[in-house]
């Protein structure tokens, strides 16, 4: 295992900058927010640790990239920021997300509620679900895993055409595996920062995807018209478990982070680290490191305390899609289907530690 450990000064500069204007901006944050973010360059911090690499196939090793500090993020001329007229994140589901209509509807509510808390202060809206056929995307059977895949680039074009006027971004979610080009095996997600659209698949997050008995395998793609999407009818959908929900929330917020202009994090263990495979994605935490949190706060303008409180409410309210909704209201809405949040409990404990630092 390799540990990527930066000096205190390097992390401090990455977080605050040496630009007097940005230093002054940082000093205007309240004392609690500065105290939490300063944990970035405290060697003994138990809240934020270094990045660990476990194999040569990990993202940083196999995809060398220049790191992005706060000043580079702030100065990026191509970075998009929500405006008063474009403060909505739209979610578009493609194909079924659950084995029943109720499960599918509840799952997307859970994801919507999580996004509302994670990108606190922005509106999160749902577009009407569509079958794969409506997108007119290319598709194939993966030669290695023998499962159906849809072309990510084609989906991005579809989402761009559907983007509402008040949208900051539109994100597509699907339980069907994605591929970005013929030479690639798969991709978890893909986003276009310029167009403000992204597509993310949760197909590989089911517990059985890599097993010999995976039910989504297709023996052979029949030589039919490229416009015949009937192969997707009743296609296999994994069970919505707590681990699958956690993995879905990670991917969704990571990719939306890219649309805000956050590049892959190379400073500390962080949600915005790249991931090349499922084991690495599981290692990646749900939280943003202080440097990436500073970037997102700059873009959205939230109170860090209120954002963390909203995330705790989402975890505590095991049946609601809305942070802070009453149990009675949500109980009525979802037909008693509990939100599987067991996998989030450890993160809740971490957030509570952060709130203690913020509210000293």
From Swiss-Prot:
Binding-site list for Zn(2+) 2: 265, 270, 289, 292
Keyword Protease: yes
Cofactor(s) listed: Zn(2+)
Active site: residue positions: 255
Secretion signal, residue range per the UniProt entry: none
Keywords, comma-separated and alphabetical: Hydrolase, Metal-binding, Metalloprotease, Protease, Zinc
Tissue specificity annotation: Down-regulated in testis from patients with maturation arrest (MA) or Sertoli cell-only syndrome (SCOS).
Cofactor mode of binding and number, as noted: Binds 2 Zn(2+) ions per subunit. One is catalytic, whereas the other seems to have a structural role.
Enzyme Commission identifier(s): 3.4.-.-
Keyword Metal-binding: yes
Binding site for Zn(2+) 1: 254, 258, 264
Alphabetical GO biological process terms: proteolysis
Pfam family of the protein (one): Peptidase_M54
Domain of life: Eukaryota
Recorded family membership: Belongs to the peptidase M54 family.
Annotated function: Probable zinc metalloprotease.
Protein name: Archaemetzincin-2
Gene responsible for this protein: AMZ2
